Amino acid sequence: MRLVVVAGPTASGKTALAIALARRLGGEIVNADSQQVYRGLDVGTAKPTAEERGAAPHHLLDLVEPGEGMDAARFAALADAAIAGIAARGRVPIVAGGTGLYVRALLHGVVEAPGRDPALRAALEEEAARLGRPAVHARLAAVDPAAAERIRPNDLVRVVRALEIAAGGRTPSELYQAHAFREDRYDAALLALDPPRAELHARIDARVRAMFAGGLLDEARALEARFVGALPARLPIGYAEAAAHLRGELDLEEAIRRVQVAHRRYARRQVIWLRRERGVAWIAPPHDVEALSRRVLEPRPPAIR
């Protein structure tokens, strides 16, 4: 069975290409975007619309409530089940998303890490509440600079988890290096979209403005009403800024600007992650769907394998 993977930075056109390939190949799409697993957070995560979902079946959207956890190991298990079901129906599984950790977990397995430490977790969360999240992130930078570079200071869930792992005797980076991700769990054709940087930034900026005009503020308002006092520590990009605008802490243009910058930085991290992955076929626009459809199903596409 050939698995098709459509990856790339945010706003690069992954959904459109995945749908076009699904319609051409008779495929179904498996989401690999960690932000689109949350129920009720549709506009701010650029989740496929009802029309797009009608054009091709989608899986692994709307899995958890905001504030709940979803890690790469759980994603890989759910994706394995979805892919098996798609293949059993005689259709082509197409994984689409820009979360590199999810894609890597699916294609190469996950790192066996130490278990959770509730006492350490509580202490670090208390420190973050007292001194701010950057202070906890600085702890991580002191023990594992490479991990600190990968994880945003405001992503408290991942920062705390990395420190839990480091407390077990080996840093996250050491564990990842030892694993090496050499195992190929699937026969996969991995496509990565590669639009010119200026074009990508323009698309990001336009998308963020459309989000604010098209419902992001309403979604942030609903979160504020649900989580009175403090939003969950780990939310997709844009919701904290939208909520700050609703509270009168940011004017609209400043909120939009901050979200645009955050998405551009996220896109850069996504590209860096993918460039470390082996066997990637970088695809520049425009996309010849017919040619790509033939290419991804070849037994050993030379530019992909």
UniProtKB/Swiss-Prot annotation:
NCBIfam families: miaA (TIGR00174). Belongs to the IPP transferase family. ATP binds at residues 8-15. The keyword Translocase does not apply. PANTHER family: TRNA DIMETHYLALLYLTRANSFERASE (PTHR11088:SF60). It comes from Anaeromyxobacter dehalogenans (strain 2CP-1 / ATCC BAA-258). Keywords: ATP-binding, Magnesium, Nucleotide-binding, Transferase, tRNA processing. One of its GO terms (biological process) is tRNA modification. Catalyzes the transfer of a dimethylallyl group onto the adenine at position 37 in tRNAs that read codons beginning with uridine, leading to the formation of N6-(dimethylallyl)adenosine (i(6)A). Gene3D superfamilies: 1.10.20.140, P-loop containing nucleotide triphosphate hydrolases. This is tRNA dimethylallyltransferase. Monomer. The lineage of its organism: Bacteria, Pseudomonadati, Myxococcota, Myxococcia, Myxococcales. InterPro entries: Dimethylallyltransferase, IPT, P-loop_NTPase. It comes from the Bacteria. GO terms for molecular function: ATP binding; tRNA dimethylallyltransferase activity. Its cofactor is Mg(2+). Signal peptide: none annotated. Substrate binds at residues 10-15.
